[in-house]
């Protein structure tokens, strides 16, 4: 893909799979024409580690936030603190935050509380919100619409991306109406992901992003291996040929 420079919009370079490997990962990413990476925070208590990785190379940016799996275990973080941390120039988004009713690792009321805090932080910082949603479409839509409604009243719009998107059409339509982007991972290349491919075809090209969510979800033809940012090329090529 020598004519195109790619961005891996969502990876986790602070995870153990990448310990001591970031320089080599960046080298392989460059060889695949991946020009930039966004490494995503899942615990505010580990934000310093995420930020240090981002500061190690100009090709890496980061986010700040609490994954819904961690909502119950992480110390309470209010909107002011998230906005404060987001002032660092390396921070380009709030999250990943959201709702996960598939694993339910945190109580649902706690997940919604933490998600609402991140939504407000994204509005106040004017940074995009990075949303994780699994088996929680209705509540995710309700929270996002509430945040978007506030933005319509006070001039601080809510922007963001639904990361590692998996169907339904309902969530895609609601997110697009609010003004969000849709980010597709290697899942879209999987044989059993026809429903996702059909939803992807409904998303305007200028609202689509690609990501790895590495070290997870390696795309075909790398499926079964530990994922890494260079593999975003395979997802991008697959989508280009499909769309």
Region annotations inferred by a language model:
Residues 1-243:
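Mid-domain alpha/beta scaffold segments of enzyme catalytic cores
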